[in-house]
From Swiss-Prot:
Top-level taxon in the UniProt lineage: Bacteria
Entry-linked InterPro entries: Pyridox_Oxase_N (IPR011576), Split_barrel_FMN-bd (IPR012349), UPF0306 (IPR011194)
Family: Belongs to the UPF0306 family.
Name assigned to this protein: UPF0306 protein PM1958
Family matches, as Pfam families: PNPOx_N
Length: 149
């Protein structure tokens, strides 16, 4: 993944997650940590929530990570697609430990750990020029050259 995209995702802390069941959309906001090595977002939630039940039947998701602004020249944000799944055993323990490097509230150990395995990411960054975008797809080899530097 391009360094600018990684840096943006790592700097933020909240994402929206959209899922569907029977053609009915549902969206939520979650605090997350980014696992750069695995290109995934780690989040926690209750296992009996509506979205958790939906995700068990349809893991395909879309989402956004953005910095709210009314000033168009400073607009920055990510749109993504991927697959979300609950983690168990060692995977859950490792992901929970990563999550705890950023968050410390008492519910972390009581909730289930989930991931979004990113498959497509599109960064819109107007600081690079109006409506400038950088895209990444799972499996893509990324150039090290930053054409925006």
């Amino acid at each position: 993944m391009h360094k600018r995209v990684v840096d943006f995702i790592k700097k933020q802390y909240l994402f929206t997650l959209a899922c569907t069941e029977n053609n009915l959309p549902w969206a939520n906001a979650f605090y997350y940590v980014f696992d750069e090595k695995e290109n995934r977002l780690i989040y926690i939630t209750g296992d009996q929530t509506h979205h958790a039940k939906v995700l068990r039947n349809n893991s395909r998701v879309a989402g956004t990570i953005f910095v709210p602004t009314k000033f168009v020249p400073s607009l920055q944000g990510v749109q993504f697609t991927g697959r979300s799944s609950q983690l168990f055993s060692t995977q859950a323990e490792q992901a929970r430990a990563l999550y705890k490097t950023e968050y410390s509230h008492h519910l972390i150990d009581q909730l289930t750990v989930w991931q979004v395995e990113l498959e497509y990411v599109r960064l819109v960054d107007n600081s690079l020029g109006l409506f400038s975008t950088i895209e990444w797809r799972k499996g893509q080899v990324v150039e090290e050259t930053d054409h925006y530097a």
